[in-house]
From Swiss-Prot:
EC number assigned by the record: 2.7.1.50
Catalytic activity: 5-(2-hydroxyethyl)-4-methylthiazole + ATP = 4-methyl-5-(2-phosphooxyethyl)-thiazole + ADP + H(+)
GO biological process: thiamine biosynthetic process; thiamine diphosphate biosynthetic process
Family, per entry: Belongs to the Thz kinase family.
Lineage, uppermost ranks: Bacteria, Pseudomonadati, Pseudomonadota, Gammaproteobacteria, Enterobacterales
Annotated protein name in UniProt: Hydroxyethylthiazole kinase
Species, as recorded: Enterobacter sp. (strain 638)
Gene: thiM
Gene Ontology molecular function: any one: ATP binding
Length: 256
């Protein structure tokens, strides 16, 4: 999948605006997430202390809430960060990692849905569970297909007024009325930890860009799919794929 004009327009905004993206993400993926954002032209920051998180969320252009390694103190810090972002009119994005499979994070994510996320990005099982249509998958792994979760994504978008991206072999991005389909990528993306979480950070950054938010989130998904398609041709396994993936993001304009 080559980036189209819309994707390149969004990429131009990434590169020229360098959105400061506050990533309250899980401990496993922080470095990879930061490198993905940097390769696209965004500016990552990982601030987790509750008092600082609230302050920084108000300064940043966008906030990501990823519950992959959620703890009670971190949940408190995330709430405060969301409050800071909302008070400053900054968009925040939810990545409901393993929601439906684990009870504490499921309750937490259901509670913060009322705080008006700009976007929600999850796999099929997570989106189904968050929409109240399924018990969830096997931890961070999905047991459903993205297409099977599309009705749940549409319902969740209508309920929350957020852009919902349900991702997998094919990605679907919806605002509850319009839906975009993004193809491409490679199965190797599932063999490197953090590609989904990093996508959520790119989605968060995209929510701060001017223009149609649905299109910007779809463009974010397209960037990652395109990089995966390129990286698999330049790599010999998961280790080299991760490096090639970052390089492919960096070189997106040259590939268009």
């Amino acid at each position: 999948m080559q980036p189209d004009r819309l994707d390149l327009h969004a990429l131009h905004h990434f590169r020229t605006r360098s959105p400061l993206t506050h990533c309250m993400t899980n401990d496993v993926v922080q470095t990879f997430t930061a490198n993905v954002l940097l390769a696209l032209g965004a500016s990552p920051a990982m601030v987790i202390e509750a008092e600082e998180a609230e302050q920084f969320a108000a300064m940043a252009d966008a906030l990501l809430i990823n519950v992959g390694t959620l703890t009670a103190p971190r949940a408190q810090a995330m709430r405060r960060a969301i409050e800071g972002a909302m008070a400053a009119g900054k968009p925040w994005t939810l990545d409901p990692v393993a929601v439906g499979a684990l009870s504490y994070r499921t309750r937490f994510c259901q509670q913060i849905l009322s705080l008006k996320p700009a976007a929600i990005r999850g796999n099929a099982s997570e989106i189904l569970a968050l929409a109240g249509m399924s018990a969830g998958g096997r931890g961070v792994d999905t047991t459903d297909t993205a297409s099977s979760a599309l009705p749940a994504a549409i319902a969740l978008a209508r309920q929350t007024h957020a852009i919902v991206a349900v991702t997998g072999e094919v990605d679907y991005v919806t605002d509850g009325q319009r839906t975009q389909t993004i193809t491409g990528g490679d199965v190797m993306m599932t063999r490197v930890v953090g590609t989904g979480c990093a996508l959520s950070a790119v989605v968060a950054a995209s929510c701060s860009l001017p223009g149609d938010r649905l299109n910007n989130v779809a463009a974010a998904c397209g960037f990652m799919k395109q990089a995966g398609s390129v990286a698999v041709k330049e790599s010999r396994g998961p280790g080299s794929f991760a490096s090639a993936f970052i390089d492919a993001l960096w070189n997106l304009e040259a590939q268009a």
